[in-house]
């Protein structure tokens, strides 16, 4: 999957609810952890939009119990034709307690499936230097480095924009955003500073992360700012 321009993913745990045509969105983030039988859903998917498969662990804000089955399913998803990219948590690749993601990373690489290596903080915003370290490590491990944090003030939001610009200007492919009320506006602003991937719910009221805009609203905001 190419990230020459900003791409917007519609997030859902139900591939049957995925947009039938690419209006306002460019791909579907399939939250496998929210689906009853995610691999069967991928096999049955016949939509035109490529899929970003995410099987988010419960320790990173998702619903999947940690363990080999979670990673096995993500690795199998990476081998599925409709899947263009997979999301693997940074912690699943580097932290001693949770580092079981290597199988999914290897499966993605073997099939030329794009890897998004992600780091989330649902409680706050690390320091600017800490965010730079997290994002830099994520970029070094995957094709795209994703960082999502929760600003507590406008200074935190500004730091998200700063780290986005720093790594984008250095030629890295990044996906960055602030979550929650104080970070919401960054979802529209970071694409101006080089963020290449954003997220929105398939339908209003079905957000998968705090502060998401509806797809049409987010695309309109980004277009107006550009």
UniProtKB/Swiss-Prot annotation:
TM region positions: none
Domain of life: Archaea
GO BP annotation list: 3,4-dihydroxybenzoate biosynthetic process; amino acid biosynthetic process; aromatic amino acid family biosynthetic process; chorismate biosynthetic process
Pathway membership, UniProt: Metabolic intermediate biosynthesis; chorismate biosynthesis; chorismate from D-erythrose 4-phosphate and phosphoenolpyruvate: step 3/7
EC number: 4.2.1.10
InterPro entries: Aldolase_TIM, DHquinase_I, Type-I_3-dehydroquinase
Key words, A-Z: Amino-acid biosynthesis, Aromatic amino acid biosynthesis, Lyase, Schiff base
Active site: 120 (proton donor/acceptor), 146 (schiff-base intermediate with substrate)
Keyword Amino-acid biosynthesis attributed: yes
Disulfide pairings: none
Gene3D superfamilies assigned: Aldolase class I (3.20.20.70)
Keyword presence, Lyase: yes
A GO molecular-function descriptor: 3-dehydroquinate dehydratase activity
Binding-site list for 3-dehydroquinate: 29-31, 56, 187, 208, 212
Reactions catalysed: 3-dehydroquinate = 3-dehydroshikimate + H2O
Quaternary structure and partners: Homodimer.
Function: Involved in the third step of the chorismate pathway, which leads to the biosynthesis of aromatic amino acids. Catalyzes the cis-dehydration of 3-dehydroquinate (DHQ) and introduces the first double bond of the aromatic ring to yield 3-dehydroshikimate.
Family membership noted in the UniProt record: Belongs to the type-I 3-dehydroquinase family.
Name of the protein: 3-dehydroquinate dehydratase
